[in-house]
Curated annotation (Swiss-Prot):
<dbReference type="GO" id="GO:0004930">
    <property type="term" value="F:G protein-coupled receptor activity"/>
</dbReference>
<keyword id="KW-1015">Disulfide bond</keyword>
<comment type="similarity">
    <text>Belongs to the G-protein coupled receptor 1 family.</text>
</comment>
<keyword id="KW-0812">Transmembrane</keyword>
<feature type="transmembrane region" description="Helical; Name=7">
    <location>
        <begin position="275"/>
        <end position="295"/>
    </location>
</feature>
<feature type="transmembrane region" description="Helical; Name=1">
    <location>
        <begin position="29"/>
        <end position="49"/>
    </location>
</feature>
<keyword id="KW-0552">Olfaction</keyword>
<feature type="topological domain" description="Cytoplasmic">
    <location>
        <begin position="222"/>
        <end position="239"/>
    </location>
</feature>
<dbReference type="InterPro" id="IPR000725">
    <property type="entry name" value="Olfact_rcpt"/>
</dbReference>
<dbReference type="InterPro" id="IPR000276">
    <property type="entry name" value="GPCR_Rhodpsn"/>
</dbReference>
<keyword id="KW-0472">Membrane</keyword>
<feature type="glycosylation site" description="N-linked (GlcNAc...) asparagine">
    <location>
        <position position="8"/>
    </location>
</feature>
<keyword id="KW-0716">Sensory transduction</keyword>
<keyword id="KW-1133">Transmembrane helix</keyword>
<dbReference type="GO" id="GO:0016020">
    <property type="term" value="C:membrane"/>
</dbReference>
<protein>
    <recommendedName>
        <fullName>Olfactory receptor 3A10</fullName>
    </recommendedName>
</protein>
<keyword id="KW-0675">Receptor</keyword>
Length: 315
C-alpha cells in the first residue's frame, strides 16, 4: 500500500525491526545465546510444572499460582524470542503490520496477567502467615480460580485497549522500529498522527497494571513482616521469611525492569537502553524464576529430582 492511498488509514504494511545489533558478525553469537536462554527457560518452567504435578506436597494454593506463573513465563518468552531468532538467522527482520500488532497484544496480555498474578501470590502469603486459621477456607480452589480469572480479564482489557489504540494510529512514513520486538514506545515514535490519547492510556494502564499491584503487594508484605517479627522462635522467623523471599525476589526483578521501561512519562522515544531493559524483562526474568523458586525449597528440589530421574513419589 502506498502512503496516503487510503487517506487516514495506515499506509505502512510492515515494520523493520533493527534488533539488538546491526553487526553481522555478532548475530550468530546472539542467536546461540538466546536460543540457549529460550531452551533453558522453557525447560526450567516445564520442570517446575512437572514437579508441582507429581509432588503431593506441592498441591497447595501457593504452588497453584506458581504453576500459572510458569505457564506465563513460557508464553512471554515465546512471544518475543522465537521471532527474534528467525530475524537473527535472516540478518533482516521485516514484520507484517498485523503480526506486529498481534505480538504487541499477546505480550501485554501475558505480562499483565503476570503483574496481577504476583499480587495474588502476595495475598496468598498474607493469608497463610497472618490468617492461618481461616486460610483453607479463604483460599479455596474456587477462590484461586476466581483470582486467576480476574487477572486474565483485567489484563485482556488492558492489552485490547492498547492494541486498538495503536491500530488506529497513522503510520505513513518511516517503518524502522528501534527494538527487537513490537512494543508501544518505539511504535509511538513512528506514528505520524497524535499519540496524546495513547500516552494517557499508557499512564492509566501503567497505574492499574503496575502501581496498584505494587501497592497491594507492599501492603501484604508489610502485614507479613509485622506478623513474622512477632514470632519468638528464630527458626520460625527464618521459615516464614523463606517462603516469601523467592516471591519478593521475582517481584523486584519483574517490576524493576517494567517500571523503567514504561514509567518514563516524559519520553516515548526508543533507545538502545530500552533494548537492554527489554532483555531483562522478556528473557532474563522468565529464565531466572524457576531457579529462584527452587533454589531454597527442598520440596521443589525433591520433586524435580524425581521428575528428572523418573522415580515415583513414595506411597
Amino acid at each position: 500500500m502506498e502512503p496516503g492511498a487510503w487517506g487516514n488509514r495506515t499506509a505502512v504494511t510492515d515494520f523493520i525491526l533493527l534488533g539488538l545489533t546491526g553487526n553481522v558478525r555478532l548475530q550468530p553469537i546472539l542467536f546461540v545465546v538466546f536460543f540457549f536462554a529460550y531452551i533453558v527457560t522453557v525447560g526450567g518452567n516445564l520442570s517446575i510444572l512437572a514437579a508441582i504435578f507429581v509432588e503431593p506436597k506441592l498441591h497447595t494454593p501457593m504452588y497453584y499460582f506458581l504453576g500459572n506463573l510458569s505457564l506465563l513465563d513460557i508464553g512471554c518468552i515465546s512471544v518475543t524470542v522465537p521471532p527474534m531468532l528467525v530475524c537473527l538467522l535472516a540478518h533482516e527482520c521485516r514484520v507484517p503490520y498485523a503480526a506486529c500488532i498481534s505480538q504487541l497484544f499477546f505480550f501485554h496480555l501475558l505480562a499483565g496477567v503476570d503483574c496481577h498474578l504476583l499480587t495474588a501470590m502476595a495475598y496468598d502469603r498474607y493469608l497463610a502467615i497472618c490468617q492461618p486459621l481461616t486460610y483453607s477456607t479463604r483460599m479455596s480452589r474456587e477462590v484461586q480460580g476466581t483470582l486467576v480469572g480476574i487477572c486474565c480479564t483485567v489484563s485482556f482489557i488492558n492489552a485490547l485497549t492498547h492494541t486498538v489504540a495503536v491500530s488506529v494510529l497513522d503510520f505513513c512514513g518511516p517503518n524502522v522500529v528501534n527494538h527487537f520486538y513490537c512494543d508501544l514506545p518505539p511504535l509511538f515514535q513512528l506514528s505520524c498522527s497524535s499519540i496524546y490519547l495513547n500516552g494517557q492510556l499508557l499512564f492509566v494502564g501503567a497505574t492499574f497494571m503496575g502501581v496498584v499491584p505494587m501497592i497491594l503487594i507492599s501492603v501484604s508484605y508489610a502485614h507479613v513482616a509485622a506478623a513474622v517479627l512477632r514470632i519468638r522462635s528464630t527458626e520460625g522467623r527464618k521459615k516464614a521469611f523463606s517462603t516469601c523471599g523467592s516471591h519478593l525476589t521475582v517481584v523486584c526483578i519483574f517490576y524493576g525492569t517494567g517500571f523503567f521501561s514504561y514509567m518514563r512519562l516524559g519520553s516515548v522515544s526508543a533507545s538502545d537502553k530500552d533494548k537492554g531493559i527489554g532483555i531483562l524483562n522478556t528473557i532474563l526474568s522468565p529464565m531466572l524464576n524457576p531457579l529462584i523458586y527452587s533454589l531454597r525449597n527442598p520440596d521443589v528440589q525433591g520433586a524435580l529430582k524425581r521428575v528428572l530421574t523418573g522415580k515415583r513419589y513414595p506411597v
